[in-house]
């Protein structure tokens, strides 16, 4: 089942499903709202139509994306292609990413998490807290 917090977030936006596509950053499945995929599509469309990188992004994200509808219990059916990409066989882990989430094979995520924590620590100065808030909370 899709995490209740995310399915409720999508329901509030008027969606009864989620867009999924294979991550090109790691062996996971990216999941997002229709609004998010439209923003990604607009960003890709803003690239020069004759540049190779535009085709790379369009193929890797848009051509591979699938609109999956929730069933009555908030579940989605992932395609074999998506499951193979994430190397998911028996169990899967839903990992929240703010307004999106990823679906991982649990052992692969645990390995990724170690690397992610190290890199986040090295890059922590890049998080500009005060730019995201109007009050003095982050100062």
Regions found by a protein language model. Name each.
Residues 1-2, 31, 74-78, 82, ...:
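Short, structured motif recognition centered on aromatic/hydrophobic residues
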Residues 21-28, 95-100, 122:
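Short amphipathic alpha-helical linker/capping segments at the junctions of internal repeats
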Residues 30, 34-68:
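Helix-adjacent hinge/juxtasegments
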Residues 66-89:
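Beta-rich strand-turn-strand
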Residues 102, 106-139:
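Short, Lys/Arg-rich amphipathic alpha-helical interaction segments
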